[in-house]
Amino acid sequence: MQSWRRRKSLWLALSASWLLLVLLGGFSLLRLALPPRPRPGASQGWPRWLDAELLQSFSQPGELPEDAVSPPQAPHGGSCNWESCFDTSKCRGDGLKVFVYPAVGTISETHRRILASIEGSRFYTFSPAGACLLLLLSLDAQTGECSSMPLQWNRGRNHLVLRLHPAPCPRTFQLGQAMVAEASPTVDSFRPGFDVALPFLPEAHPLRGGAPGQLRQHSPQPGVALLALEEERGGWRTADTGSSACPWDGRCEQDPGPGQTQRQETLPNATFCLISGHRPEAASRFLQALQAGCIPVLLSPRWELPFSEVIDWTKAAIVADERLPLQVLAALQEMSPARVLALRQQTQFLWDAYFSSVEKVIHTTLEVIQDRIFGTSAHPSLLWNSPPGALLALSTFSTSPQDFPFYYLQQGSRPEGRFSALIWVGPPGQPPLKLIQAVAGSQHCAQILVLWSNERPLPSRWPETAVPLTVIDGHRKVSDRFYPYSTIRTDAILSLDARSSLSTSEVDFAFLVWQSFPERMVGFLTSSHFWDEAHGGWGYTAERTNEFSMVLTTAAFYHRYYHTLFTHSLPKALRTLADEAPTCVDVLMNFIVAAVTKLPPIKVPYGKQRQEAAPLAPGGPGPRPKPPAPAPDCINQIAAAFGHMPLLSSRLRLDPVLFKDPVSVQRKKYRSLEKP
């Protein structure tokens, strides 16, 4: 009995001691483990751990980080937000229009590229009075000259001060109500929802196009290092994962990178890239990691990630606590291959969509501001964080992913089963009676629109059809073929020329193929591009070969959204080129679709009697002349404007089942395609 009482007393004493320990130390442990929960609707930055004073007590005075003594102060106007410091009433007419203050004195090549990218965009205006946003370049990287206060400053209201480098220009005037678009701003000075975080751009960053992502195999190859650590002097060093302390103490094997000779330009050759969060200069390594397909691992970052307002960086980067090196390394080693694959794919998409050129960075900045202006009509997160990205998914067309051709598969939907035929009638201006009857006979045709582009008067009579026929007169430019007419009521467009010659069966089969590939162009006659070594440029041929990269728009199916891109996204110079050289319009339209989809067009067969001819050729069966080739410099001018060559070659042609098979004709659905 006494033994039992002693055990009970001992158990009570242990319980009381444990309870006292919990009461005394529990609150401190909670403060150590959990950051405060953000209030609903409040902006959320990087985690701010509450135990900094506890951790510093374990360090020697010389080991404390230098930049931890005096955090950067918020800029003047820190109380500004979008509602109080920006007047959206100036943007109600034409949306976002940007005026750039002219530079004074000598400017750097980077600033010259910025000016060129804005002046060639749909946002630019020559008049400050008609501008919704006034842009001021703050600091010249080469000359170090600072901008002075402009005449229309108005306390900075509706102004955007652009800083390309983390080190700010010494201020000769107060920012007031101006927004700041700065490279790698610190989390203490950044105003969420008002300022815009930019990437740290190198001086030699290309104006347009840019180099593609360097990831060639999404699954890590055997022997490739798991970790790469950025260095203060530039370059990367790979980590031997056998030593868990290697990434933090510098004992790593040097890796020059694939095919690189200059250390400062070396791209990391690893699966994960460890990037310090203390030094703003480390942000310059962030873009290198994205381009290389190396998953960025940010160690307690103190700078805002670029475009964090719209880009979901949890899908492409990892934020880790630098105080837990062993746990971070173990977590990276145990990460599933599926997760690694998803992160690496997202790095390549983000690099190509928003960061590969100066033009994309500037246009992304303006799109972020335009989304704030539109409010409820802004891009949803899916459009920003899924290919092809918000720059190619114009919110002026729609903000619903279901309306864009490249999101059908992701949304589990498919386009409607009807199309609109758009027939371009140029000189000599004869009504395409047979073509209208053939197209109207399709069970999928919803309407026919005839674009009359001729000096001759309109015919008084048109053929009677089972579908509505609308004639639009007065459009003389070739680019008017690709205008987003409000009368087009279907997703699919069948673009035709008055000289086209197609049968109803050909139209039906081509449309069914397009329904399976709504983001691509489906056509009958193809052409291809090639690199001409002799002339040092791109060439174009309409000869029948085993490969093709373009289809003629004189007989092709595509989604109506590409009319919106053609009219509202292309630079005016390219549309003028299409009007002055009509044969260039096919190349230009194929460039647009290829740049969006990263895929080649699809070829479908046409009747046997037309195998040696183009469907745009006039007349009846028999040999017909080949379509005229574009001007020699056409494809090169378009490629220069895009900054790269988006066209891709294909060897695929889709035929109906049983096409030309030795079976009964009665068993074939599209038997007319094989008739002589």
Curated annotation (Swiss-Prot):
Recorded GO CC terms: endoplasmic reticulum membrane; Golgi apparatus
Subcellular location: Endoplasmic reticulum membrane
Membrane topology, Cytoplasmic segments: 1-9
Top enzyme class: transferase
Function as written in the Swiss-Prot or TrEMBL entry: Glycosyltransferase required for the biosynthesis of heparan-sulfate (HS). Transfers N-acetyl-alpha-D-glucosamine to the nascent HS chain (GlcNAcT-II activity). Appears to lack GlcNAcT I and GlcAT-II activities.
Species this chain originates from: Homo sapiens
Spans within the Lumenal topological domain: 31-676
Disulphide-bridged cysteine pairs: C584-C634
EC number annotated for this UniProt entry: 2.4.1.224
Domain of life: Eukaryota
Family of this protein: Belongs to the glycosyltransferase 47 family.
Phosphoprotein in keyword set: no
Catalytic activity: 3-O-{[(1->4)-beta-D-GlcA-(1->4)-alpha-D-GlcNAc](n)-(1->4)-beta-D-GlcA-(1->3)-beta-D-Gal-(1->3)-beta-D-Gal-(1->4)-beta-D-Xyl}-L-seryl-[protein] + UDP-N-acetyl-alpha-D-glucosamine = 3-O-{alpha-D-GlcNAc-[(1->4)-beta-D-GlcA-(1->4)-alpha-D-GlcNAc](n)-(1->4)-beta-D-GlcA-(1->3)-beta-D-Gal-(1->3)-beta-D-Gal-(1->4)-beta-D-Xyl}-L-seryl-[protein] + UDP + H(+)
GO biological process: heparan sulfate proteoglycan biosynthetic process; protein glycosylation; skeletal system development
Comp. bias regions, Pro residues: 618-631
Gene3D superfamilies, A to Z: Spore Coat Polysaccharide Biosynthesis Protein SpsA, Chain A
GO molecular function: acetylglucosaminyltransferase activity; glucuronosyl-N-acetylglucosaminyl-proteoglycan 4-alpha-N-acetylglucosaminyltransferase activity; glucuronosyltransferase activity
Protein's UniProt name: Exostosin-like 1
Sequence intervals crossing the membrane: 10-30
Keyword list, A-Z: Disulfide bond, Endoplasmic reticulum, Glycoprotein, Glycosyltransferase, Membrane, Signal-anchor, Transferase, Transmembrane, Transmembrane helix
Pathway(s) served: Protein modification; protein glycosylation
Record's bilayer topology term: Single-pass type II membrane protein
